Amino acid sequence: MFSLISFTRQWASVYKPMQHGRKDARGRVRKRFMCIENIAQLANFAKELQSAESPFVAVETNIGGTLTERFMSPEYNVYFFVMGKGKLQDNDGEDADTKQEAMEHAVKFLMYLRQHKEEVNAKGMGMDGASMIDTDNVRFETFGPFMNRWFCVGISLFGLEKMGCINPDDYVSQEGQEEKE
């Protein structure tokens, strides 16, 4: 089954600017991927943010969305962080460049996800979950600066899942309840 968290972790490990999980020149393992509850709770992952390397990607584990009569449309949020250069006061437009770099990482992630969807569809693998994510209509927003001059671009991906029917095995039958009483 498709998991956006696993997919994003795998992307971060093969994407050259990140190479999550591989050793750097000093022999340290590069941490370029993390899960966060949500972007509003930056304080909860501030310690990890201070030790993270630029660029890195984070997936929000809280999921929102909408339910209609027959469909569920979950919203998934992915954030692409880049450390700004220079001092906050003397940036001379560097903040805009940093945000643009974060946006470039987000676009490359979306292209990779689209390619995965096309491969799944071409192989006739059915609906693996990735095919249910709309990569044509993506909302994005910039955030920052955070501590140590971090900036990020957050993207919101929307899914569409058909809700199934009631499974009678999930419930106690009427006869079963009457026997108890």
Can you describe what each PLM-predicted range is?
Residues 1-71, 121, 170-171, 179-181:
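Small/polar-rich, solvent-exposed N-terminal microdomains that initiate assembly or binding
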Residues 20-24, 99-160:
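Acidic-leaning, charged glycine-interspersed low-complexity segments
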Residues 35-37, 87-91, 135:
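A generic structural signal for ordered alpha-helices
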Residues 152, 157-181:
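C-terminal tail/extension regions appended to the core domain(s) of diverse proteins
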